Structures are given as C-alpha cells and as structure tokens.
A protein has these predicted regions:
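Short hydrophobic alpha-helical segments of the AMP-binding
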Residues: 61, 107, 181
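General beta-strand structural signal in soluble alpha/beta enzymes
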Residues: 71-74, 96, 116-117, 157, ...
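Conserved beta-loop-alpha segment that forms the PLP phosphate-binding cup at the N-terminus of a helix
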Residues: 68-93, 103-105
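Active-site phosphate-binding strand-loop segment of PLP-dependent enzymes
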Residues: 125-190
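Substrate-binding/gating loop at the entrance of the active-site cleft, primarily
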Residues: 96-121
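Short glycine/serine/threonine/alanine-rich loop segments
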Residues: 67, 112, 186
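N-terminal glycine-rich, Lys/His-bearing helix-loop that initiates the first secondary-structure elements
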Residues: 1-37
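Conserved N-terminal alpha-helix of the aminotransferase class I/II PLP-enzyme fold
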Residues: 28-78, 98-99
Length: 191
C-alpha cells in the first residue's frame, strides 16, 4: 500500500481501482449488493425507451417526493451538472456545510462560487465531537446577509459530510439551517 500511494503522489485519485481492496474515498457505488439486487440486474428490461424498470423507479420517486418530473442519472455528479447549469452562473454563490468535490466542480464550471461554512470543530481532526458535519449557523446567516439572498440560488447541506471525513449532521442543525433558509426564501438542497 505504501508503494502504491507513493507512486500515485499521495493523490487517491491517481490510485488505479484494481489496487484498491476497500474504497474509503467515497461511498458511491461501493456497497455490497444483495442477491435480489444482482438478480434484478440480470432480469433487467434493457429497452431503449419505455423500460418497465423506469416506470417502477418513476412511481417510487413520485410517491416519495410528490414531484411529477423524474430524470434518472447515472450518478450524483451528472445530476449536479444539470442542476448547476440551470441555477448557477456568474455572480451567484452556493453556500454549504462543505461542498463535495464534484459539487464544487459543477458549481464553479457554471461560473458561480462555492463557499464552505463548516462548524469550527470540523477542522480540528484530533477532536472527538459528534456532528462535526454541521453547518456553522451564525456564519450561514452572516454570509447570506453579506451577499444578499438574491445571489444565493440554494443552500446545500451535504449529509453525511463526505469532504470532512464523512461526519454526521444533526437533525437540530438541519432544522435550524432550514429555518434560516426559509426566512431568506433560499431553497435548501439536501445532498
């Protein structure tokens, strides 16, 4: 492992996937699948359009969210690309407890700015404390007042906070951040 890391310049994105036994870089697509999930792949309707599996998915998403439009994407980064190409752009700022790397990239590609507002304890790595993924609520409100709510298309709460070590966010912090966002009429995007 040491030689692999050294060869990669200590950059985890340069480590070939076949050299990784357990992926601790991300939680995307690395979980074990059940026998039923694998069987579902084998039974999958691979029609170009009108696949039965899409309608099952669409119905479930509509029931959960109440939203009519459902656009499936292969991963979160593709959804981010669509979202930020629509709501992003120069002069806009996206606030977050901490942007995930692909989220930040998609925000910045749109011409907008990404600002992280983690609680101070999040950066004290040796300190053991619950909910180090929380947003700093005072900093959030101060930044909204500084920039003006009209320049902030949405606030992003990343749960769990991957960029800061997978730290959890408390429900209390999420509720209070939501109240601040509602007060300033800024949509809260739960990632």
């Amino acid at each position: 492992r040491e030689s692999i890391l050294k060869e990669a310049g200590y950059n985890l994105f340069n480590v070939p996937a076949e050299k990784v036994l357990i992926d601790l870089l991300t939680d995307s697509g690395t979980s074990a699948m059940s026998a039923e999930q694998w069987a579902g792949l084998m039974r999958g309707d691979e029609s170009y359009a009108g696949a039965k599996s899409f309608f099952v998915f669409e119905r479930a998403v509509r029931e959960l969210t109440g939203m009519r439009e459902v656009i499936p994407v292969h991963q979160g980064r593709a959804a981010e690309r669509i979202l930020f190409s629509i709501v992003g752009g120069p002069g806009k700022t996206f606030l977050s407890n901490s942007h995930f790397d692909t989220t930040r990239a998609n925000v910045e590609v749109s011409g907008a700015s990404a600002v992280d507002l983690p609680v101070p304890s999040a950066l004290e790595f040796a300190r053991s404390e619950p909910f180090k993924g929380n947003v700093d609520l005072k900093a959030l409100e101060a930044k909204i007042q500084e920039l003006g709510p009209e320049t902030i298309p949405l606030f992003i709460m990343t749960v769990t906070n991957n960029s800061l070590g997978g730290q959890p966010v408390s429900m209390k912090n999420l509720r209070e951040a939501s109240e601040i966002c509602r007060h300033y009429k800024i949509p809260l995007f739960l990632d």
